[in-house]
Amino acid sequence: MAKVVDCVLLLAFIAVVRGQEACRTPDHRDGVCHPVQQCPSVRDEFFNSDRVLSEDEIDYLRKLQCKTKDVTICCPDGVTTVDRNPTAVRDGLPNPKAFECGLDTLADRIIGGNYTAIDEFPWYALLEYQSKKGERAFKCGGSLINGRYVLTAAHCLANKKLDEGERLVNVRLGEYNTATDTDCADGNPDDCADPPQNFGIEAQIVHPGYDKNGPYQHHDIALIRLDRDVTMNNFVSPVCLPPDDFPPTSPGLNVTAVGFGHTGRQRHSGIKKKAQFPVFAQEECDKKWKNIEVIGEQLCAGGVFGIDSCSGDSGGPLMVKRFYWIQEGVISFGNQCALEGWPGVYTRVSSYLDWIRQNIRR
């Protein structure tokens, strides 16, 4: 018994010395909070194969999460020296199983149209436009998918205003509050984000099937190649795209949207917000949008009064949590904003993985 006590005390001492927290797993084992990639048993059991995790396994992983500032789980193994270098994520699509994407803080959140935490959804991109008069405004969103590319909607890069002289001039990553120069959590000067990163545009790649003058928003997807590499940190990192064997989210289950879009009073929100709402069955969506011709490369979600993604979020990500965040859709269009019974329509990312891979380069 004395040896057991000594071991527990030693583990706690090591955790304090290394700045890690002691914890207890859901199956009542003592552990230490570490990044997943440093925990061999969890890494090998859940992430070193191509199989799709079950709902029970996903629930277990969620319960393993530590309430720490960084992304950690309760690991019963101790530490290994394997670590991810986030700056190594560059031109290829990041690998979820190598923990190169889809990770943000894991503290408890209340979702439902609320403001995000300062370091939640660090892949969100703001697209800034300049009018012919020189006025600048953020009008679309996007998502960082690797160290050089942002995924967005085609209508954010090809539309009537752009034909008339408006220009996309800037992509901003790592923004939380557009009204402040330095973003701090709850005004705490000791808990602040790194400065946002602004990028010029090297290339704009609109899907060739998108028709900006057509009656439908089919193939509403595009890529932006930034003018330089992104610097990865806790406030800027990529989202995961769906694996090839990704099972779509079933109707009735929730997905999450994020952005700086309109509030209920149609005013643009200066702070990053999130909303959670259910996926719509495809046949029900077809009935609602019978004049639009919703196709298989699109999905529908929302239709809950007061909770939806609005026009200011065009091009932003629609996501599902599979321990890490996977982008399932690109925000395309809707009927007004958060209208009861009317789902928004999103471009289905899994339908365009080959096109995305073919159009990203070094």
Curated annotation (Swiss-Prot):
Q: An example of a Gene Ontology BP annotation on this entry?
A: protein processing
Compartments, record wording: Secreted
Q: Which UniProt keywords apply?
A: Disulfide bond, Glycoprotein, Hydrolase, Immunity, Innate immunity, Protease, Secreted, Serine protease, Signal, Zymogen
Disulfide bridge positions per record: 23-74, 33-66, 39-75, 140-156, 285-300, 310-337
Query: Main EC class of this protein?
Result: hydrolase
InterPro entries in UniProt:
CLIP, CLIP_sf, Peptidase_S1_PA, Peptidase_S1_PA_chymotrypsin, Peptidase_S1A, Ser/Thr_Proteases_Immune/Dev, Trypsin_dom, TRYPSIN_HIS
Segment forming the signal sequence:
1-19
Occurrences of domain Peptidase S1 (ranges) = 110-361
Post-translational modification as stated in the protein's UniProt record = Cleaved by an unknown protease into an active form.
- Stated regulation of activity: Inhibited by serpin SRPN2.
User: Could you tell me which Gene3D superfamilies the record lists for this protein?
Assistant: 3.30.1640.30, Trypsin-like serine proteases (2.40.10.10)
Recorded phenotype for the gene knockout or disruption: RNAi-mediated knockdown in the susceptible strain G3 infected with P.berghei does not affect the numbers of live oocysts and melanized ookinetes in the midgut; however, severely reduces ookinete melanization in a CTL4 RNAi-mediated knockdown background. Simultaneous RNAi-mediated knockdown of SRPN2 and CLIPB10 in female, partially reduces the formation of abdominal melanotic tumors caused by SRPN2 RNAi-mediated knockdown.
Domain called Clip: residue spans: 22-75
- Stated EC number for the protein is 3.4.21.-
Give the similarity note: Belongs to the peptidase S1 family. CLIP subfamily.
Record note on domains: The clip domain consists of 35-55 residues which are 'knitted' together usually by 3 conserved disulfide bonds forming a clip-like compact structure.
* Described purpose of this protein according to its UniProt entry: Serine protease which preferentially cleaves after arginine residues. Involved in the innate immune response against parasite P.bergei infection by activating the melanization cascade. Probably in the hemolymph, cleaves and activates prophenoloxidase (PPO), which functions in the formation of pigments such as melanin and other polyphenolic compounds. In the susceptible strain G3, appears to be dispensable for ookinete elimination which occurs by lysis.
How is this protein organized at the quaternary level? Forms a covalent heterodimer with SRPN2; the interaction inhibits CLIPB10 catalytic activity.
**Protein's name according to its UniProt entry:** CLIP domain-containing serine protease B10
UniProt organism field:
Anopheles gambiae (African malaria mosquito)
Q: Which gene encodes it?
A: CLIPB10
